[in-house]
Amino acid sequence: MSNPILKITDVTKRFGGIMAVDNINMSVYLGKIQGIIGPNGAGKTTLFNLISGIYKPTLGSIHFCGEDITNLKPHRINEKGIVRTFQNIRLFKNMTILDNVMVGCHNKENEDILDALFKTKRHKVEEQKNKNKALSLLDRVGLIHLRYEMPDSLPYGLRRKLEIARALASNPKLLMLDEPAAGMNEQETIELTEFIQSLKSKDMAIMLIEHDMKLVMSLSDSVYVINHGLKIAEDSPEEIVKDKAVINAYLGEEDV
């Protein structure tokens, strides 16, 4: 197997006397979808916050593309190709749908403050490239005809797709989705599942936290199970649903 794009080694996070994440080891690979499941409060979102730099580990290290990113600030981690969404959708309500996606196109590599300030020819060319890219992404998620509308005009499921389109605009190598199906009805969840499946690419890895078992089991190449901050299992979806420790900790009698 190729080298992992993300390698988490012995990562622990304490908040006072609370052990939120306890000695987690994980490898994530390009072209794969890594599912992460566990009960509420298990440490899943804390793990995402550690990877994205919002929290710093108490112990352990995180490497991305072979580089130690453990102590980098969130914006530096983002620039290296790690992009995430959140449980609660975070869109710019006062910007159009198109402008929301264009925000994701801007990064340190292609932006020059003076070019933007004086609206130079180079800036205008770059802005047109960003607009074309944003339009292409909106077309992909079925929102191009609504590009000049405001995000609040969209139903919940489409707002979630818009948030993912904005994340994709920055060309991530690792896309982290935190409960993307939360609050969706059955039809919206089916459409989201198909959309996430369409995102699989040899050039990008996806990490997926999700409570909808049907979604996470149908999409994931591998599933990592956390309970009380500890890993209790890691295997294929087919094996995870048969694991007694997982059933006791999380799945219960739920039909998956």
Segments from the language model and where they lie:
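Glycine-rich phosphate-binding loops of nucleotide-dependent enzymes
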Residues: 2-256
